[in-house]
Amino acid sequence: MSKNLKKYWKSEIELTNSDQVEALRHNEFVDKLPIDSILEDKKSLQDSSTNRRDFLKYLGFSTSAAVLASCEGPVNKSVPYVIQPERIRPGIANYYATSMFDGYDCANILVKTREGRPIKIENNKLANYHGSANARVHASILSMYDSARIQGPISNGKDISWDDFDLEIIQKLDALRFNNKPVVLLTNTIVSPTTSKIISSFTDKYENITHVEYDSISESSVLDAHEIMYGRRAIPYYDFSSAKYILSIGADFLGDWLGSNYDGEYAKGRIPVKSKDSKAYMSKHVQIESNMSVTGANADIRIPMKIALQKLFLAHLYKKVASLDISLPGLDSVHKLKLEEIYNELISFGKSALLVCGIDDVHAQILTNSINDLILSEAKSSTKISLIRKGDSKKVNEILNKIKNSEISGIIMCGVNPVYTLPNSNMFLDSLSKLELSLNISMKMDETTSSCKYVAAASHYLESWGDFQFVNGEYSICQPTIKTLFDTRQFDECLLKWSGNNTPLYDVLKDNWNSNILESNFSWNKAIHDGVYSVKDNFKPKLVNIDFSDSIKKLIDYKVEGFELCLYSKIGMGDGQQANNPWLQEFPDPISRVSWDNYLTISKKDAESIGLKNYNESNGALNSNYAIVSLGDSQLKLPVLIQPGQTNGTVGISFGYGRSLGVKAEMMTGSNAFMLYKNFSKVQDVKIKPHHEIHEFACVQLHNTLMGRGDVVRETTLEVFNTKNKNHWNPIPVVSKNHIETAVNKKEVNIWEEFDRSIGHHFNLSIDLNACTGCGACVIACHAENNVPVVGKREVRKSRDMHWLRIDRYYSSDVSFSEDKENKENINGLSDSLSVFNEMEDPNENPQVVFQPVMCQHCNQAPCETVCPVAATSHGRQGQNHMAYNRCVGTRYCANNCPYKVRRFNWFLYNNNDEFDFNMNDDLGKMVL
């Protein structure tokens, strides 16, 4: 039998402070029971005439009364249809194909509606590209049912009608055009062919208007590099399913890199598939990065490295691939060996290899493109390009300077929030008030909208018509799934109206598709039904001769004096557009397992040198010191999270938090990292000093500890998988039979009667841990499907989170190097041995990571069923574990007896409860239930 020598641990504290964690494991209740207050009046208790028999009688009656009362069903009053719509059958869901793009996230999706209400997002399997929804796309449905939405047009702080609003705006625009005063139309990236035509018509009428696209988190380095090398400003498209060797240098492609939707393609290559030689093959993934990312957590080999060293490493790699005879600063012996190994693998895999790079530097992107071209990588598409990022930071800076110098007289904005996302937002805010026209087309009264003279209430994408082209040749349609909830209007409709075009947007959209997109054999109705449509539109690059030696010189000319700050976006919060979404606020980060916060990630070594600590008060209550991060005149105070795998000398902060307007008070969490986003660069040279305050995190990484589990995760290498019998890496469970450990089948040891499985269906759900990347989309989907309540940060700290599905994240390291003879024998040279021994000495430096989704297993003989005193939980004939809520009296015996620790209890009534002011306490928010 194979013995797994790895040690699995959930946090740095669990690894280093076993006594504290052991005490927390046995602490069933976070709050102590108020025994002292119960026994406070001892005299009255002593003088009581109630005897033991009477006490038990009262107790028995109260328990019986509770059980009887619990059997009363709730009464819900409903209002029926006056006239039943023909196509709507009560209880039967309808699905509509549509698409979503908010300037940051995009997806081709299906929307589940019930009685005319959109209630859930699903993937559109007909889509060739971007056919899956991430956590934020799943949660976006709740953003429609947000009572904080603007409900009509506003002029100078007063509600007015659309007719009066249009009249005022047209008069302003005509006056500015007549006087030839410049106006800026500032939007997020536009990927809609129809919207692009409408904007073109609008700027043709008003020639003084300049359209500028602005991405809150810029990808200009990638776009500029592609334009320099291939003649078009776009993002390369990567097919991870066809890559057998993936080298990523700083690219979190399973996170938010380039608006990524690569999870599905990546997962296809990670599932071992047998070939003709009967061996299974899967892609090999090497990740070089500074922050511990979701992509790094999924890599076969992860190499922590500072950005400055990443640039030098990339330059050396290009030198070897291109066979250049140039002089470069040297690498240390460890990284020299890594370089040689990676180079040899890259060349041996050749066209099956792929290099992706997340370094925010145009020269790094140029070298990356060139390496892929030199190895003839087939995973980097030669015909497809991604169009979901177009923002040009140079043009945005030019506009900002013109606004500052009073060279701009008006601004119209849509899909952007520069007062929040610009590092120099105070300057922009001061200039905004001086403009003759300041207009924002927005759904929320956010930081920018609240400072504008005119506000056009925008519709949600689920209330809108539109189209998108995320990838060249791949079109998708956005159609409304519900009538507008408020007196709102789309951006396109506003521009049509102000251009003097009264044609309905639907007709403009349909005419554009019939004239310019659809072929004669494909109908408009079919396109709406499918939601997607493909045409042959291959990208033809225009190759340009480039002096790559100049890029190498500029790339390596980079030095950092203090800490290297790496700004990034979380899978949950993104760029902060959905900060008022409670599902996303309570969503635990896949790596840190922290919800309701952002923080400064730092390595254990650096934290100790500065004097920063983390410590647990309970299984959900992680406390930490604050730190002051300084960059020039800007300072940001954040709590510190000691992150295993963080590169020494680097720190990380996520965007998307620190919102101050347009969100409920409960959602005003974290700090605004955009303050440190100088020159639209994700890497900054910062100074850090400790602060005396203590911060309280809601961190679920020690929740639901599985007791008595040795090998928490069954895993092995591909080589062992191919060469050994499955019982070697997945041993058969044994029991003691006649004092001998014997492998027996289930029937021999089962103490319960078997269920009859010969009738009806028997449901089963399997999760392929090779394919799971830990992205958490399923967690939000489960929230939506099962109406799971949001409990808030305070309750999460008490281990009272209500997620029915959780994704456990385990770090792993070897327990004892002396026991691992095979590893010792495979050591190659002094450098390798030092590296291996260092890993054994401090697993925190670079642990391996594994994700494990856990939900109700619907056990055949479920332990929760046998201990319930009132039979509230029972077993169905189709194998499911059933729950009768109105029978439950809350003993929580089932939670105590669940080996997977997936039982959830509502400690309060969250519906219509002002203490939990989230979507269930909101008349509009409850529409998603």
Question: What is each PLM-predicted segment?
Answer:
Residues 2-334, 339-340, 594-598, 605-609, ...:
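N-terminal export/assembly segments and adjacent metallocofactor-ligating motifs
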Residues 184-186, 246-250, 354-356, 409-415, ...:
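Structural motif
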Residues 301-403, 516:
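Active-site phosphate/pyrophosphate-binding segments
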Residues 256-277, 423-438, 474-477:
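A short, gly/pro- and small-residue-rich
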Residues 515-592:
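Long, low-complexity segments enriched in small/aliphatic residues
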Residues 210-229, 290-294, 376-405:
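Short connector loops at secondary-structure junctions
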Residues 444-478, 802, 906-928:
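Flexible glycine/proline-rich, aromatic-decorated loop/lid segments
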Residues 484-540, 794:
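N-terminal leader/propeptide and maturation segments of large enzyme subunits in energy/redox metabolism
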